[in-house]
Amino acid sequence: EIGVQMFTLRRWTQTIEALREALARVKEIGYDTIQASAFGPMPVEEVAKAVADTGLTVGATHTPWPRLLSELDDVIAEHRVLNCRHTAVGMVPPDTYLSLAGLNQFVEEARVIVDKLGASGMTFSYHHHHHEFQHFEGKSWLQHLFNVSEDFELGFEIDTHWVVAGGA
């Protein structure tokens, strides 16, 4: 399903009123689903109502890495309110992608997140940027992540802009 990633519209999603207008415009131009990300602070129930009122659905979200690590139960509960079964991490701390040790730490933590989300009927993906194309031991950091994630259910959001920017 093709939808609008709302990060691009983040200037217009910082209040519930602005979000309602942005969602109405997204629906008006022909989309049926969104990826929720970078919204201003507002109750998830209000966001869910605004989405439903426009006839849209939330197909996916981006959740900050610190929240996934420390507030995963809340993240799951919020996704239930949004009727959304998929989240991705939009950005990880730089020490994660600057070394293979950082990758190994990420994988260890991501396995726990994948398992808990999976037990709740949800899936999880990694959204990359250009810096994951740095090479370590002859392969890009992202290729190393692909290789080690074969034995657990980590998805990947391939961003064509960042693929080109990363030189792949």
PLM ranges: what are they?
Residues 5-9, 37-39, 63-66, 92-94, ...:
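Active-site beta-loop-alpha junctions enriched in small/polar residues
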Residues 109-115, 147-148:
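Histidine/acidic residue-rich metal-binding segments in metalloenzymes
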Residues 44, 97, 134:
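Glycine/Thr-rich phosphate-binding loops of Rossmann-like dinucleotide-binding domains
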Residues 1-86, 155:
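N-terminal pre-domain/capping segments
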Residues 70-105, 109-110:
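Glycine/small-residue-rich loop that forms an oxyanion/phosphate-binding "nest" at active or ligand-binding sites
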Residues 34, 118-168:
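Acidic/histidine-rich catalytic cores of soluble enzymes
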Residues 53-54, 82, 113, 119-120, ...:
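Helix C-cap/helix->beta junction micro-motif
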Residues 17-21, 72-73, 102-111, 138-143, ...:
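Charged helix-capping and loop-helix junction motifs
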